[in-house]
């Protein structure tokens, strides 16, 4: 039951820590297959890792990078029909037995759902300035749903800023939005919802969500996600961002141009002008997607604040034959 793990990284000093954390905390270590696109000047010492044979590693200069979606798309080219697909960021810490937990979640949900992804903003971790000590936020035991941030709806034309909504649910919830830094699914996701390399940053998650919806896929948020993400203010980041001025000086295609192309592509997606594998599906409509989220994408208006901003949109998942509590009692 192999897991293909997509890890794009941009000059991230936590890349090695992320890889080691995933490997060391996995129950079935031999089933992991990492694919890393390291956008940095010097790269990391892959040969020193005991699991180096399980890593596909590509190191490219930052000046040729075209953004995170370009990186995720390039990584997906190495997918070889693994049973599961895990997409993360390069500043992630894993809980013990995370792989068994995610697969158990997936199999429990699959009993009543065909095509779906498990995704949400993970709980946080913090670290010291030398990146040697880590503190995981394990206090929250509920489920983080995903919604929109008040005041930032349609902030970038069609794109709104997303946020996590803490709920008291101890069981999975059905939602509609995804987090690009944590997405777990069957390997079919790579085949049916491949990443468009022309997306840049803003709109990445919305584009994936609307493609999932219109192609008949569902989204589930899970309790106690077994991995943790580094959330920091830009001023305190221990790494450079893609639009760092120093990198921009030598970059052939500037980030502003990449961002403009991306926004135009996302607008075209919502107007139905994108065909083929990067386009929408025909199982459900954009109008229905908007109704579910409390938004009107055509008019760019909020039609239901409750659906847009609160947990009232989330649906509990019921499996009467196998109660959820019986399958994941150890995930705490």
Language model regions located:
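Catalytic cores of eukaryotic secretory-pathway lumenal/extracellular enzymes that build
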Residues: 2-296
């Amino acid at each position: 039951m192999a897991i293909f793990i997509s890890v794009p990284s941009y000059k991230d000093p936590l890349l090695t820590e992320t890889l080691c954390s995933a490997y060391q905390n996995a129950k079935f270590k031999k089933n992991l297959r990492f694919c890393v696109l390291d956008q940095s000047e010097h790269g990391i010492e892959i040969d020193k890792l005991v699991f180096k044979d399980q890593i596909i590693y590509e190191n490219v200069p930052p000046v040729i990078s075209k953004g995170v979606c370009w990186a995720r798309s390039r990584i997906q080219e190495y997918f070889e029909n693994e049973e599961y697909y895990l997409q993360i960021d390069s500043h992630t810490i894993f809980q013990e037995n995370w792989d068994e937990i995610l697969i158990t979640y997936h199999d429990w949900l699959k009993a009543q759902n065909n095509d779906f992804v498990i995704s949400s903003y993970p709980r946080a971790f913090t670290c010291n300035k030398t990146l040697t000590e880590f503190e995981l936020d394990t206090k929250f035991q509920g489920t983080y749903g995903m919604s929109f941030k008040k005041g930032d709806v349609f902030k970038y034309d069609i794109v709104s800023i997303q946020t996590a909504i803490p709920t008291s649910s101890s069981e999975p919830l059905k939602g509609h939005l995804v987090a690009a830094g944590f997405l777990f699914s069957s390997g079919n996701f790579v085949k049916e919802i491949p990443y468009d390399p022309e997306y840049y940053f803003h709109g990445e998650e919305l584009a994936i969500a609307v493609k999932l919806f219109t192609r008949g896929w569902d989204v589930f948020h899970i309790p106690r996600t077994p991995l943790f993400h580094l959330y920091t203010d830009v001023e305190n980041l221990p790494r450079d961002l893609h639009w760092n001025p120093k990198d921009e000086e030598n970059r052939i295609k500037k980030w502003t141009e990449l961002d403009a192309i991306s926004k135009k592509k996302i607008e075209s997606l919502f107007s139905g002008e994108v065909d083929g594998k990067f386009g929408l599906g025909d199982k459900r409509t954009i109008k229905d997607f908007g109704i579910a989220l409390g938004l009107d994408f055509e008019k760019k208006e909020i039609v239901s604040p409750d659906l847009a901003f609160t947990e009232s949109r989330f649906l509990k998942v019921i499996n009467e034959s196998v109660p959820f509590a019986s399958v994941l009692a150890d995930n705490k």
